[in-house]
Every structure is written in structure tokens, then in C-alpha cells.
């Protein structure tokens, strides 16, 4: 698919089912459903569908070195990033993700090492589920858009690492990924603190940050 309209018309049954899910409230903490998809593993400068659709969250992948995975899609349609593994940066499978998988695929075991944005995607859906569970415990309720905004801002910055090159299945020019991996690397702790109402700030070593206190304490706050 190359556009939202093409996806919505060509995959109508899927689109309509997900639209129903989005519009239906099944949890007291939120007024609708959240759809999370992988961005794709083609190293393309755009998210693949269905994840690229405007109402869904599309997840890119970074490897254990906190840099983009060699295969991840990036660019338009991508919303947030999470660990997905990258076998090319290590001599064995330690740089990939231990995942559940059909036992008949892996010599009778229910687990195997894999990589991909499909490994990254469950990190984000899991963090979202954890956040909604905590919101229920806290007696909080959010609109769908409010919660998605909180999720997409509960991230660690990746931009300062996107400089130079990385050797992973070829040479990757990291500047090509700037502002294209989504808002950053998903952080469960930051989401829980947002739900709790506790300010949670992270600043890089040697960096300076100007923090407006009104963002956390209202218009009457003053710096001391």
C-alpha cells in the first residue's frame, strides 16, 4: 500500500475491524483501543502498512548498541522505537531477542532467537498495557489521544547518537535516521511517572536543559 486511502479500501475488513476496536472502550482507564504495529524490516525510508496508517502506532527497531537496527524501516509514518535485535553486530545470537515461537519451528522448543520490528512492537504494546494497568490502579481515566500522547513522549532521546557510521550488514550512515525513528526509545518508567504525575526528566551527560516549571507545577510556579 502507498497511502491511507489505498489501505483502507484494499484491506477494508481489517481496517473496519480495527476502526471498531479503536472506537470501543473496553477499559475504564481509556475511552478506546490502541493499535500498535511494526514499521517493517525492509530498511525503507517509510513505515510499511498497516502500521503507517494514521490511526495506528508504528514501531521502529534499535539494536543493543542503541542505534538503528540494520533492517528497520524509518521515516514518514514511524512513531516510536524499541529494542528489536540485530544479528549483524555480533558473532552469535546474543544481539537478537529471545522470543516465543512455534515449537515445531525450533526443534521442539517454544523459544528461539529472532530479530525485527516485530520484536520491537511488543515492547511498546506491553508498555502501553502496563501504563493502562497502572492508570486503573491510580483511578485515572484518559482519552485515547491523551494516552497515546503520553506514551509517545515517554521516551529516551536517540538523536544525539545518530552521527557517523555503523557497520551492520553494510555501512549505515546514521545521520539518515535523524528525526525518522519516531519520538525516541520507549521508556516504561517515564510513562508510569507521567500517569502518577511525578516529573521525570533525563538530560544527557554534559548537556544543558532549560526546564519551564509551569509545565509541571502550573502557572504560579517560579524558579528559585
Stretches with model-predicted labels:
Residues 1-55, 65-67, 104-123:
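Substrate-binding/access-modulating region of protease and related hydrolase catalytic domains
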Residues 26, 40, 185-200:
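Secreted peptidase-domain scaffold signal
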Residues 26-35, 54-58, 78, 146, ...:
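Loop/turn elements at helix/coil->beta-strand transitions in domains of secreted/extracellular proteins
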Residues 62:
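Carbohydrate-associated surface elements
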Residues 85-86, 90-181:
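Hydrolase catalytic cores
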Residues 197-224:
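Extracellular ectodomain surface segments
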Amino acid at each position: 500500500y502507498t497511502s491511507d486511502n489505498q489501505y483502507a479500501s484494499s484491506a477494508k475488513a481489517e481496517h473496519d475491524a480495527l476502526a471498531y476496536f479503536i472506537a470501543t472502550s473496553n477499559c475504564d482507564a481509556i475511552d478506546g483501543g490502541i493499535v500498535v504495529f511494526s514499521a517493517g524490516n525492509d530498511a525503507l525510508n517509510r513505515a510499511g502498512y498497516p502500521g503507517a496508517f494514521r490511526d495506528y502506532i508504528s514501531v521502529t527497531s534499535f539494536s543493543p548498541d542503541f542505534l538503528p537496527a540494520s533492517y528497520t524501516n524509518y521515516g514518514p509514518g514511524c512513531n516510536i522505537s524499541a529494542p528489536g535485535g540485530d544479528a549483524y553486530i555480533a558473532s552469535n545470537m546474543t544481539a537478537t531477542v529471545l522470543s516465543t515461537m512455534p515449537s515445531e519451528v525450533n526443534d521442539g522448543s517454544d523459544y528461539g532467537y529472532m530479530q525485527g520490528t516485530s520484536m520491537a512492537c511488543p515492547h511498546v504494546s506491553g508498555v502501553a498495557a502496563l501504563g493502562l494497568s497502572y492508570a486503573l490502579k491510580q483511578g485515572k481515566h484518559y482519552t485515547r489521544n491523551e494516552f497515546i500522547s503520553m506514551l509517545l513522549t515517554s521516551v529516551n532521546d536517540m538523536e544525539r547518537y545518530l552521527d557517523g557510521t555503523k557497520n551492520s550488514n553494510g555501512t549505515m550512515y546514521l545521520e539518515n535516521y535523524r528525526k525518522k525513528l519516531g519520538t525516541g526509545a520507549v521508556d516504561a518508567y517515564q510513562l508510569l511517572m507521567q500517569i502518577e504525575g511525578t516529573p521525570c526528566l533525563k538530560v544527557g551527560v554534559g548537556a544543558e536543559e532549560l526546564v519551564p516549571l509551569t509545565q509541571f507545577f502550573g502557572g504560579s510556579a517560579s524558579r528559585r
